[in-house]
Amino acid sequence: AHVLVAKALTRTEKMLCAIARGLDIVNVSWIKTMIRKRERIDPKAHVLRDRNREHQWSMSLPDVLSRSQDNPSSLLRGHTFYIFKHTEPSRDVLTRVIEAAGGSVEHATGKTDARVLASDQAHVIGSAADETAIHALQSHYTKAHGSPLAVYTAEVVLAGVLRQQMDWTSTYQLSAT
């Protein structure tokens, strides 16, 4: 597929994967216009606009699509995400979104090798439900590296792919428990 037709801007797996891959995202008027004119119409003239959601999520869909179309499936290229079991949305959904953005995914446990996490391009994603395993991994990492391990919520991926701009600050870090 090269085009996603939508009535509204959402943060669904389908929408995020389309953004990550640099697909055109259009409103329903694109289809109606093509039916009326009986010819293919450039989708760029019918880019979806949802000003309320764009404002809510601090982004502009046309700007985001421009960035993603310049370098499709590249936002997370070279990045590996170690994802704990109880993350929401599910590890499967996050995997598809991350892979659409060019990244890769591994399963994280309390016994994940701390050496692989030392890279600037290795990121851990977890949730409060994984607290025991996260604590074990953080302890292991701190002993090996002398510094704390940042663990992010899934929001780092969802918001980053939505905006086509990653935020590795503490904004999306899982709070210490």
Regions found by a protein language model. Give the residues of each.
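Short hydrophobic beta-strand segments
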Residues: 71-88, 124-126
